[in-house]
């Protein structure tokens, strides 16, 4: 809605509350989120360019400004230095890399957690980096408001970023045409009447855009090689912990 008001880049940092029953070492019910939405002019890769540059700047800044603090963390929680190169692969290339090394992955389904970690290891071996991005995810693995690939509607204009074999953010080009948005919602079995206000917002005119949401505690966890995300939050909240 803000982009409809001709603000072409929107950034927000703040608390996020997610009532998700995910008892894992990488999920929290409360965390600090960095949300980004932006207009692009020629191709949704413009979003990937900005995000990649942002992450690289963050990682380089941590090394330059907080080397002393990172050393202290490493004394209690030893970790390998984070390797960062700007590597971009298509989802199909990721599937091929897995297949070439004897791992099975359906090209029209999302990566399993196990295959995410395996692919992260293979990417590190091949490209010498702990940071990379995959783009062009299958349509079956994305929500209804994700723009389809204009050349193959089995895939989408979407992307994930990874650190040490774990996803740190998912994003995509959003559908900005109200008629197509309603059609995709109906295709997914969502009653259009229940989201009519959302669809109506695009009737005022909205440029092509996309973005993502990033959980900063997970970024810290993976940068420092910490096994449990609860170590990265002062007062962690998960489905079984409300206090202190």
Predicted regions and their residues:
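Class II aminoacyl-tRNA synthetase catalytic cores and aaRS-like
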Residues: 1-244
């Amino acid at each position: 809605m803000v982009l409809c008001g001709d603000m072409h880049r929107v950034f927000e940092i703040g608390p996020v509350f997610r009532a998700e029953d995910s008892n894992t070492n990488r999920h929290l019910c409360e965390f600090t989120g960095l949300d980004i939405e932006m207009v692009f002019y020629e191709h949704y890769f413009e979003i990937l360019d900005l995000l990649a540059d942002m992450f690289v700047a963050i990682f380089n800044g941590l090394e330059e400004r907080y080397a002393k603090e990172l050393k202290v963390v490493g004394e209690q929680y030893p970790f390998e230095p984070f390797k960062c190169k700007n590597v971009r692969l298509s989802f199909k290339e990721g599937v091929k890399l897995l297949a070439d090394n004897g791992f099975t992955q359906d090209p029209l389904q999302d990566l399993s957690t196990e295959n995410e970690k395996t692919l992260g290891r293979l990417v590190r071996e091949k490209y010498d980096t702990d940071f990379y991005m995959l783009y062009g995810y299958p349509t079956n693995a994305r929500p209804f408001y994700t723009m389809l690939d204009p050349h193959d509607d089995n895939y989408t204009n979407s992307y994930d970023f990874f650190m040490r074999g774990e996803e740190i953010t998912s994003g995509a080009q959003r559908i900005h045409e109200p008629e197509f948005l309603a059609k995709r919602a109906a295709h997914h079995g969502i009653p259009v009447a229940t989201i009519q206000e959302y669809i109506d917002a695009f009737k005022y005119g909205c440029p092509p855009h996309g973005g993502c949401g990033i959980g900063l505690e997970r970024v810290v966890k993976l940068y420092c090689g910490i096994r449990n995300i609860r170590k990265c939050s002062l007062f962690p909240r998960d489905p079984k912990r409300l206090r202190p």
